[in-house]
Amino acid sequence: MKIVGAEVFVTCPGRNFVTLKITTDDGLVGLGDATLNGRELSVASYLKDHLCPQLIGRDAHRIEDIWQFFYKGAYWRRGPVTMSAISAVDMALWDIKAKAAGMPLYQLLGGASREGVMVYCHTTGHTIDDVLEDYARHKEMGFKAIRVQCGVPGMKTTYGMSKGKGLAYEPATKGDWPEEQLWSTEKYLDFTPKLFDAVRSKFGYDEHLLHDMHHRLTPIEAARFGKSIEEFRLFWMEDPTPAENQECFRLIRQHTVTPIAVGEVFNSIWDCKQLIEEQLIDYIRTTMTHAGGITGMRRIADFASLYQVRTGSHGPSDLSPICHAAALHFDLWVPNFGVQEYMGYSEQMLEVFPHSWTFDNGYMHPGEKPGLGIEFDEKLAAKYPYDPAYLPVARLEDGTLWNW
């Protein structure tokens, strides 16, 4: 089964998405997501100029060989642009292979390991009362795992805040220049335990409670914070400190039993190796679009399972519905599954990407259609051209550039 076509589409039905479409001589079509928030055109160019021409004429069934060819053959290995492009190719080829087999991808991977995929939602608010109201809404929807973020008194901007009540959180801003946001670690550390106390006092411990620190703390600050919130029994604290220096997680681990989740910015198993091998984290948050697709994620998950580290894949709506569809198939199969992030998509986005997944009482299922179970409406996508947008930049109150 030969590859006869490979096309790249950049569309913005509310968010910029990079879509790869691979076509075979049998007429089968595979879809992959190559979206890299704020750097979409870099990945699109990498695909168009380098990978797509080298796909033509290859056997679509030889997924592993193609993966290795693009990874090892590039010499300049890893990195978010390279790995996002490889991820899209890999997803599309698995989509084709499952369609050729006439089965949903999760069956091809080895079948379901569970009845459904537990997903966690995002709750947000500028005050604790706003968060409690949003939490109640998501609890009523059936979510069993809920992330909470709240505006911090005295700070004009706080990570995770939506631009209005009832709106989804959207960090990127349109235009050619990123928004600059202020950050105060001291105010955050003083306030955030009060948020968890309010949530647990009102709703109890029925739901899993998650929180994202978004790389903002130093190791010793993260250790102190993790210790201070143990009574609230968080499912995890996410990205407590930048993970470039992975040894620093030993300090955090030595001081708290609050579970740690890391990895959304990782793009290969080598980024995860030390954290997993030394059991410095509990959940690995690598994502289908940035860590090598199905093939890359399988390697990471298999390695993590040796150390009882579970998956908790990154899944915001700045990754396209194609990524989410692939993630659900992977999550349904992978033995050491933990939870899957799910922010939801607008109707406009889902019109461009018709899907077969379902949500019921806090769990999702990818559906039974062959392949990934998702489509791409090219004509409709063409109505939504690329619209430049960038993630924010953070500064401390004295003007020092900080980790966003």
From Swiss-Prot:
Catalytic activity: D-mannonate = 2-dehydro-3-deoxy-D-gluconate + H2O
Record site: Important for activity and substrate specificity: 316
Keyword Metal-binding: yes
Active site per the UniProt annotation: 159, 214
Cofactor(s) recorded in Swiss-Prot or TrEMBL: Mg(2+)
Keywords assigned by UniProt, alphabetized: Lyase, Magnesium, Metal-binding
GO molecular function list: magnesium ion binding; mannonate dehydratase activity
Gene Ontology terms: biological process: amino acid catabolic process; carbohydrate catabolic process
Cofactor: how bound: Binds 1 Mg(2+) ion per subunit.
Binding site for substrate: 37, 122, 264, 285, 314, 318, 341
Origin: domain of life: Bacteria
A matching Pfam family: MR_MLE_N
EC number(s) given by UniProt: 4.2.1.-, 4.2.1.8
Binding residue positions for Mg(2+): 212, 238, 264
UniProt cross-references to NCBIfam families, sorted A to Z: ManoateDhtManD, PRK15072.1
Stated role: Has low D-mannonate dehydratase activity (in vitro), suggesting that this is not a physiological substrate and that it has no significant role in D-mannonate degradation in vivo. Has no detectable activity with a panel of 70 other acid sugars (in vitro).
Similarity-based family: Belongs to the mandelate racemase/muconate lactonizing enzyme family. GalD subfamily.
Protein name, UniProt field: D-galactonate dehydratase family member Ent638_1932
Organism from which the protein derives: Enterobacter sp. (strain 638)
Lineage of producing organism: Bacteria, Pseudomonadati, Pseudomonadota, Gammaproteobacteria, Enterobacterales
